[in-house]
Structures are given as structure tokens and as C-alpha cells.
Amino acid sequence: MSKPMAVDGSRKAQRLPRASKLVVVVAKAMNAWKDFVADLMKIESLRLARDEAVEDWGEDIPTTLLFGNLGKSVAERFDEYSPEDRAYIFDTIERGMRAENVDLKTFVATGLLESLYAQAHRDGALLTRMEMQLGDVSRAY
């Protein structure tokens, strides 16, 4: 038998913090991947890849697809990046893979890294050069 609802609404008040926590968790997850993408936007070609994907799909582009487009762009332009930009990109990817946020790790792994690998796999020498740039967690994935 369920407990009767308190006249003063205290049970409802007790439920509110749980709902608020869910909103906070969802907001943090969204901020985590958006912050990650914002970090990559410091590289012009990745900003253009993001803009092109959003132009094609709209602002509500599936996140994994967006990350896949970013991975494809990294692979296609790998040799054009300066050593500093390359290090920045792969350090950012590794930070994403080491993040506490499970959603961010999933987007980086199943979107960005899988797309990066699919593109690089066609050229063994490129794949080898990229693997040298990957951090331990990214390489293990």
C-alpha cells in the first residue's frame, strides 16, 4: 500500500531534487560534448567540417554523426596540420577518451575515432602515422 500524499506537498518537494539532478546530469553531458567540439573548433578545418555538417543536417545533427564528420576531417587533412595542431587535436581526443563523462567518451569513441580509423585504414602509412599521435586510451580503443 502506498503512503498517503502529505497535505503540505512535502512528497512532491522530495521528488523535485531528483528531477533537478537529472536535468543537471543531462546539462553536464551536453556541455561536455559541446565543450569538446568547441575545443576542436580552434582548428580552422575542423570548424569548417562542423559548419558543413550543421548546414547539411541542421543544428539538431545527431551527435555521433557530428563527431564522425570531425574524425573524417582529421583523417583527410592529417598531413596538412602543423605538428602543433596535430598534437593539439590528438591531445583533445585523448582528453575526451579519459573524461569522466560517459556520453562524451562514447561520442569520441564511436563517432570520431571510428570514423578516423575508417578513413585512415585505406592507407596503411597514414594509419601508422596517426597511431603514433594517439594517446594510450585512444589507441587501446
Positions of predicted regions on the chain:
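N-terminal amphipathic/basic-hydrophobic helices that include classical n-h-c signal peptides
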Residues: 1-29
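HEAT-repeat alpha-solenoid elements in large eukaryotic scaffold proteins
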Residues: 63-72
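Amphipathic alpha-helical binding modules
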Residues: 103-141
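Amphipathic alpha-helical scaffolding segments comprising HEAT/armadillo-like alpha-solenoid repeats
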Residues: 87-90
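Eukaryotic alpha-helical solenoid repeat scaffolds
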Residues: 32-36, 121-122
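A contiguous, surface-oriented mixed alpha/beta subdomain in the mid-to-C-terminal portion of proteins
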Residues: 48-64
